[in-house]
Every structure is written in C-alpha cells, then in structure tokens.
Amino acid sequence: MTKKQLHLVIVTGMSGAGKTVAIQSFEDLGYFTIDNMPPALLPKFLQLVEIKEDNPKLALVVDMRSRSFFSEIQAVLDELENQDGLDFKILFLDAADKELVARYKETRRSHPLAADGRILDGIKLERELLAPLKNMSQNVVDTTELTPRELRKTLAEQFSDQEQAQSFRIEVMSFGFKYGIPIDADLVFDVRFLPNPYYLPELRNQTGVDEPVYDYVMNHPESEDFYQHLLALIEPILPSYQKEGKSVLTIAMGCTGGQHRSVAFAKRLAQDLSKNWSVNEGHRDKDRRKETVNRS
C-alpha cells in the first residue's frame, strides 16, 4: 500500500503581519489548521495525524507566542526535513516596521517582545531573531500594502491546486420578502414586479418547480426580458468573484411569499449557471405556506 503524502504549510513571520488572516485563508482552501502550535509538539502531532483522505493538507501557525519558539524551531525543522511522506513549506509573513507600528497602534496591543512598552523596539528584536527563519522560507509575503482580501487572494494563488481553484461554488436560492432577506445572500434580486400566480386558484397551491407555475411565470414577455438581462449581468462577474478567492457566492431571488415567481427564476438560473459552474439550488420558503396551513 502506497503511503499517502502529508502536505504541511508552516505559517510564521512578524507579529502583526497577518498570520490570523493567513490561517483563515488556508482553512477556506481546505486545509486542517491550528493556530499557535508549540514547535516541540509538531513532529509528534504529525505522527498522530490520522490520514483519512488522499493528500491531506495541514497549515499550522508556529510563532514566538510559544516561549520556547526560538530555541526549538531549528531542531524541529531539521527533524521534519528527514520525515518520510512529508512535503512541507514555510510561509513567512512580513511587513515594514512603520506599517507594523501602525497596526499595533490601531489595535492598541503591545508587542510581545517590547519589554519597555516601545513597539518599535519589540519589532526590531523580533526581526533580528526571525532573520534565519525568513532566509529558510520558501514563500515570503510582504503584507505592507495588502488588505486582508488581497492577502487571501495572494495565498489562494500560491497554495491552491487545480482542484481547489475549481472549488468555487454558487448557491442559487429563492425566498419570500415577507419572511426576510437571507442574511447570507451576496446578490439579491426582486421579481415581485412580475404577474403573480398566487391569484390564480389553479396555481395557488403549486410552486415554481411545478411545470404549470414555471411556464406561467417564465412565458410572460417581461419575465424573459428580465431574465436575459439578469443572466447577462451575472455571468460576466462570476470569474471575478472566483478570482477574489470567494469560495461560495449566494444569489437570492425574492418574491412576496417565496413560493411561485422567485422559485421559477431560481430554478432556471441554477440550470443555466450549472452548465459552467458548480451550482446548488435551494428554495427557503417554497413550502412554508403549506406547512402553515397544515398546522392550523
């Protein structure tokens, strides 16, 4: 049996350079993540990892919050170099002293190495102590001019494999405005201006997934015109959402009760987008009226 390879990214670097954002980014990329791993525990932890999937991936923040960091890290890295079945890289996050000082002042936190309270002194000492580790790092990212979003994008470009790059998923959902707009929606579209099947007795108790209602909604000229404009708006911007590192884009179609018009539109949009993207279709309020009637 072929031994599975473990992929490890050790995230380290200057305090305030963005390690928290980085570890969150790795989690979004499908890595198992741990923040503030004591260096001495790292080899033992890797031995205890139960490999359940092909090519398991770990991202661990190892930094100077562990008091033994500087005395242990070199020996630990030497041990990892000789460990079979392990592919590991060091990601070092850095930033200019001026920017680090500004970030500390913004958060009103003290630097862990600033014994006398002077932030700049702590930064200079940390930079001196971390210089050998920075020189060993395969990936050095300067976050001085990067926003958190830009850092996430940078890490996604460097550490996403082909499968991860294609993991962008679209959630297309319908909802009723009377029950509130979905709090997780990224894009919200209102179709309440269209003719409402609710006022036709033969369609009232059906939903937009049923053919008679779907045909009634979509066969109106204004429905087709709006849908074509909607598709022309959404399709060109999807690659940009993916490029920005967004893992899930939620598109919500709303009508009054979330039973007829929005359901039909969400159904059609999901079908069309699924030709080129990974799409999930959902209808939050489709059966809400039926459930209310049954309870009464």
From Swiss-Prot:
What this chain does, per the record? Displays ATPase and GTPase activities.
Establish whether keyword ATP-binding is in the entry.
Answer: yes
User: What GO MF terms are annotated?
Assistant: ATP binding; GTP binding
What is this protein identified as?
Answer: Nucleotide-binding protein SP_1566
Query: Which sites bind ATP?
Result: 13-20
| The keyword DNA-binding is annotated on this UniProt entry | no
* Keyword tags: ATP-binding, GTP-binding, Nucleotide-binding
Q: Per its UniProt entry, which superkingdom is the organism in?
A: Bacteria
> Which positions bind GTP?
63-66
State the family named in the UniProt similarity comment for this chain.
Belongs to the RapZ-like family.
Q: Which Gene3D superfamilies match?
A: P-loop containing nucleotide triphosphate hydrolases
Pfam families named in the record:
PapZ_C, RapZ-like_N
